[in-house]
Design a protein with these regions (language model features):
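NTP-dependent small-molecule kinase module
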Residues: 2, 104-105, 145-148, 167-214
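Post-Walker A helix-loop "phosphate-sensing" segment adjacent to the P-loop in P-loop NTPases
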Residues: 28-36
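Conserved nucleotide-sensing/catalytic segment adjacent to the nucleotide-binding pocket
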Residues: 36, 45, 49-93
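ATP-dependent NMP and nucleoside kinases share a basic, alpha-helical "lid"
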Residues: 97-149
Length: 214
C-alpha cells in the first residue's frame, strides 16, 4: 500500500487529439513504481447490453456507456493503496482476446477518459486537469486512420459515428470543462517533439509537487 494519498492527474481530450501518444510519452518519464494509469476505456459496458440505434451502430460516446460505479470504485481503491484488476476492453474486435489488467498503486495516479470531468464524483478527486485539443478536421483524419487499421470500420461507419456520436458527446460532456483545466495542450501536429517537450515539462512539475516537504 502507498503511505500517502497519490497525486491524481486527469487527462481528457477529443477523439483524435493524440491522447494515446501523450499518455505513453507522459508515463515513460517515470519509473514503473512511480505512476499508475487507469483508463475509462476499460469500463465500457459490453455493446450487446446497450440499445442499438436504427442503423445498428452502437453509441459508445455517452456517459451511460461506461460502468461509472466500477470506474469510480477502482479509482478510490487505488487512492487507498490497493491494486485493482480489470479485463481489457477490446472495442468489440473479435480478433483480439482480452487480457486481465492489474493496476498497482503509485505516488502519481493518472485518470484518463472522455467523461472524467463530467462525472462529478471523479472530477472532485483530481489534483490536476489536462485537456488535449486538436482542430476538428485534423482529429477526424486521425480517427479515420486509426479505425481503419485497428478496428476494421468502414469510412462510412467512422464518419457516421463522428458526426452523430463523437462530436455531439465532445461538445456536451467535455468541451464545457476546458477552461476549468489547469493546462490546455493544443496538438495539431504529428511531430512528436511537441508532445515530448510538453510531457517532459509536466513530469518535472509533478516530481516537484509530490516531493516530500521538509
Amino acid at each position: 500500500m502507498t503511505a500517502t494519498k497519490p497525486y491524481v492527474v486527469g487527462i481528457a481530450g477529443s477523439s483524435g487529439s493524440g491522447k494515446t501518444f501523450f499518455l505513453h510519452s507522459f508515463v515513460n518519464h517515470f519509473a514503473e513504481h512511480e505512476v499508475a494509469l487507469i483508463s475509462q476505456d476499460d469500463y465500457y459496458i459490453p455493446a450487446n447490453t446497450q440499445t442499438p440505434e436504427e442503423n445498428k451502430l452502437y453509441n459508445f460516446d455517452l456517459p451511460t456507456a461506461i460502468n461509472r460505479e466500477a470506474f469510480y470504485r477502482d479509482i478510490q481503491r487505488l487512492m487507498e493503496g490497493n491494486s485493482v484488476y480489470r479485463e481489457e476492453y477490446t472495442f468489440n474486435n473479435p480478433s483480439r482476446t482480452p487480457k486481465m489488467i492489474e493496476t498497482t498503486p503509485a505516488p502519481i495516479l493518472i485518470v484518463e477518459g472522455l467523461f472524467i470531468f463530467f462525472y462529478e464524483e471523479i472530477n472532485r478527486l483530481l489534483d490536476q486537469r489536462i485537456f488535449l485539443h486538436a482542430e476538428e478536421e485534423i482529429a477526424l483524419q486521425r480517427r479515420l486512420r486509426r479505425d481503419f487499421a485497428e478496428r476494421g470500420y468502414t469510412e462510412e461507419d467512422v464518419r457516421y459515428k463522428w458526426e452523430n456520436h463523437v462530436m455531439p458527446a465532445y461538445r456536451q460532456y467535455l468541451l464545457p470543462f476546458r477552461e476549468q483545466c489547469d493546462r490546455i495542450v493544443i496538438n495539431n501536429t504529428d511531430d512528436p517533439a511537441l508532445i515530448l517537450a510538453i510531457t517532459d515539462e509536466i513530469s518535472t512539475e509533478l516530481r516537484t509537487a509530490i516531493r516530500p516537504k521538509k
